[in-house]
Amino acid sequence: NYLVTADVARGDGSDFSVALVFDVDTMTQVAEYRGKITPDMFAPQLYSIATEYNNALLIIENNSLGIGVLSRLQELEYNNIYFSIKSTHEYVDQLTAEAVGGVAGFTMSMKTRPLVIAKFEEFVRNKLININSMRLTNEIKTFVWHNGRPQAMRSYNDDLVIASAISCWVRDTALVVNKKQIQHKKAMLDGIKKTTTTMNTQ
């Protein structure tokens, strides 16, 4: 299984639009895109990348530019987009999101940003992430604390760092919780099947 995390830029400034692909089980980086591309062109690019990697979970920060990309991906009918519950930021699948009014994309807020960055620092420090990109490595080296806020040094970029941090956060929170819920449901269903079989044989 794979996840693709994207950070969307306008395509005409100093920031880049980026997409990172990680193996969910090992958190090994397997692919990377970084370029100055307009949001309307980035959406089909992301569709192709996520489809190529086994219909990967596609995580896009739902800022002003990200919302447009998310809308376009929904028009393209990509069916494995990251959704969350607006009030709690809790991950839900697309079907559940439609029922409970979930929000497409990942919300990076004043509340979630420090948690996301801290999770990335934990993954890097404990070697829980395998980075195969010199560009990402260089961004990490210039990602510093400034006025109480972790960010890129002046004239440097942090697009890949932020996308990687979101990947680590989603992998270690939303996907782990979701996996446990699936295992719990499976155990319950297995128990029901076993009980039914026992009753039928008596």
Give the location of each predicted region.
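RNase H-like, metal-dependent nuclease domains and their acidic two-metal-ion catalytic environment used
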Residues: 1-88, 92-95, 110, 114-118, ...
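Surface-exposed intrinsically disordered loops and tails
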Residues: 95-102
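Amphipathic alpha-helical blocks and their helix-capping loop/short-beta junctions
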Residues: 104-110
